[in-house]
Amino acid sequence: MTDLPQAEGGCGAGNERLAAQAAAAGNAELMARFKADYPVGPHDKPQTMCPAFGALRVGLRMRRVATVLCGSACCVYGLSFISHFYGARRSVGYVPFDSETLVTGKLFEDVRASVHDLADPARYDAIVVINLCVPTASGVPLQLLPNEINGVRVVGIDVPGFGVPTHAEAKDVLSGAMLAYARQEVMAGPVPAPISGRSDRPTVTLLGEMFPADPMVIGAMLAPMGLAVGPTVPMRDWRELYAALDSKVVAAIHPFYTAAIRQFEAAGRAIVGSAPVGHDGTMEWLANIGRAYDVSPDKIAAAQNAFGPAIRGAIAGAPIKGRITVSGYEGSELLVARLLIESGAEVPYVGTAAPRTPWSAWDKDWLESRGVVVKYRASLEDDCAAMEGFEPDLAIGTTPLVQKAKALGIPALYFTNLISARPLMGPAGAGSLAQVMNAAMGNRERMGKMKAFFEGVGEGDTAGIWQDTPKLYPDFREQQRKKMEKAAKLAKAEEMI
C-alpha cells in the first residue's frame, strides 16, 4: 500500500483546503460529483449538525445492516452520541487511526479487516462503511473494498463536511449508493422479493423521510387511479431497494435526493416533483402521477373528487391566522409553507438549507406567485435577517433561530421536532398544523412579559451569574477586532499569490 497524504489541519481546516487535499489524494472525481450534486451555500461549513449523521441514521435504521465509521475519535463519539440520543438501538462500528496508520495506508487495511470480521451472513445483509472528513481528505480508498464478503454486501461512501453541506443530503449519498448497488444486482439476475410482498397494482416509490402516516394517506389517494404506494426511500430493509426500483414512477416528495434520482432515471423511471400537500398541491400532484402512469382522465378526476372536498373542509375547519416565517434543513420547508398559506397564514419568507432542484420548481413558482420570498441554501444569517425584517407572529426554524427569536420576544417553533413530526399529506395534513401554530402565536403576550421581567440581566458574553457587574473591556474588543481584520487581509493576499 502506498503512503497516503495526511490531511493537514484535520477536520478544523477550511473547506477549500480540505477539498483540495482530497482531490490531490485521488478523490478529485468524488469532489467534482459532490460539487455537482450538492452545490454549496454562502457559508464555509455546514450549519446543521455533522452531515455524516444523516447517512449514519439511515444505516442504523435498516434491518440487518451494520454501519461502520472511519474518522476522528471526537467526531465518532459525537455521531454515536447523537444517534443514540435520537433512538438508535444498535452499536456504531468504529475503525480508529492515528497519524502513522493514516499516512502509511495501514488504516485502509484496518478497515478491510474490520469488514471481514463483521461479514456474517447470518446477521447482516450489508455493511455500510462511512469515511468522515480526515480519511476522505487523506484519500482512504473505500472503493477498493470488496463488493461482497461471505454473501454480505459492502457499501463504502465518503461523507465529508467539506463536500456534503447538510445531514439531509447525506441521506441521499447513502441512498444513492445503495440503489446503485441494488440496480446492479437487478441487472445481473433475479433478486429476492420484499419481506412485505409485492403489490398487485402498479406502485409509486416515495422519495424522502416523512411522518409514518403520510405514506398510508398517499396510498389511499392513489387507490382510485388503480395505483398503490410503494417503498419509501431511505428504506428500512435491503430488499425494499428492489421494490423501489421496480416502481415505474418515483415521487420526489423531498426534492434534494439527487444521487437517488440519478439511479432511478438510469433505471428508466419517471420522476414527479412536489407532494400532495394542501388542496392545490394534492390536485396537481394526483394529475401528474396519473399522467406519468397513463391513467385515464376520468380515474384521475375520480381521485381528485374523492379527496379535494375533504381537504378543503379540513383546511376551512382549522384556520391559521398570523404572519409566519418558515426555515429549516429538512427539505420540506416549501411544502409546509404552502400548507400554511392555504390555511390562511401570511408567509412572507421561506428559507431552506437544501439546494434548488427541478423537483421543487412547482412549489417555488406557487409560493412566489403569492409574494413569498423563497431562499435556497439559506444560511442562519439569512433566516435571522428575514425574521427580524418581517417581524412575524411566529418564526419556524432551527434551534439557533428559535433561540434568537425568543430572545426578541417572538414566539418560535423548532421545525424538525414540532413540524416534521406531524402529517402533511392529503386530508390528514390539512388540519394538522393549526393547533400548534395558533397556540404558539397565542404566547406572544406571555413572551413579552418574560422579556420585560428579565430585562437588564445581561445577554451574550454578559449573561449568566456574576459576583460583580461584568466588565466589557471595549479597548480589548477593538484590539482583537483589528487583529482579526489584519489576519483576514493577510490570508486574502496569500490566496492571490
Curated annotation (Swiss-Prot):
Keyword Phosphoprotein annotated: no
Q: What does the record give under GO molecular function?
A: oxidoreductase activity, acting on iron-sulfur proteins as donors, NAD or NADP as acceptor
**What Pfam families is this protein classified in?**
Oxidored_nitro (PF00148)
Describe its membrane topology: Multi-pass membrane protein
Where's it found, cell-wise? Cell membrane
Q: What is its EC number?
A: 1.3.7.15
Could you tell me the keywords of this UniProt record?
Bacteriochlorophyll biosynthesis, Cell membrane, Chlorophyll biosynthesis, Membrane, Oxidoreductase, Photosynthesis, Transmembrane, Transmembrane helix
Q: Which reaction does it catalyse?
A: 3-deacetyl-3-vinylbacteriochlorophyllide a + 2 oxidized [2Fe-2S]-[ferredoxin] + ADP + phosphate = chlorophyllide a + 2 reduced [2Fe-2S]-[ferredoxin] + ATP + H2O + H(+); bacteriochlorophyllide a + 2 oxidized [2Fe-2S]-[ferredoxin] + ADP + phosphate = 3-acetyl-3-devinylchlorophyllide a + 2 reduced [2Fe-2S]-[ferredoxin] + ATP + H2O + H(+); 3-deacetyl-3-(1-hydroxyethyl)bacteriochlorophyllide a + 2 oxidized [2Fe-2S]-[ferredoxin] + ADP + phosphate = 3-devinyl-3-(1-hydroxyethyl)chlorophyllide a + 2 reduced [2Fe-2S]-[ferredoxin] + ATP + H2O + H(+)
Catalytic EC class: oxidoreductase
* Transmembrane region(s): 65-82, 126-142, 216-233
One GO cellular component term of this record is: plasma membrane
Describe its assembly: Chlorophyllide reductase is composed of three subunits; BchX, BchY and BchZ. Forms a heterodimer of one BchY and one BchZ subunit.
Question: Which purpose does this protein serve, as stated in its record?
Answer: Converts chlorophylls (Chl) into bacteriochlorophylls (BChl) by reducing ring B of the tetrapyrrole.
Instruction: Supply the NCBIfam families for this chain.
Output: BchY
Please give the family membership noted in the entry: Belongs to the BchN/ChlN family.
Protein's name in the database: Chlorophyllide reductase 52.5 kDa chain
**What organism, scientifically named, is this protein from?**
Rhodobacter capsulatus (strain ATCC BAA-309 / NBRC 16581 / SB1003)
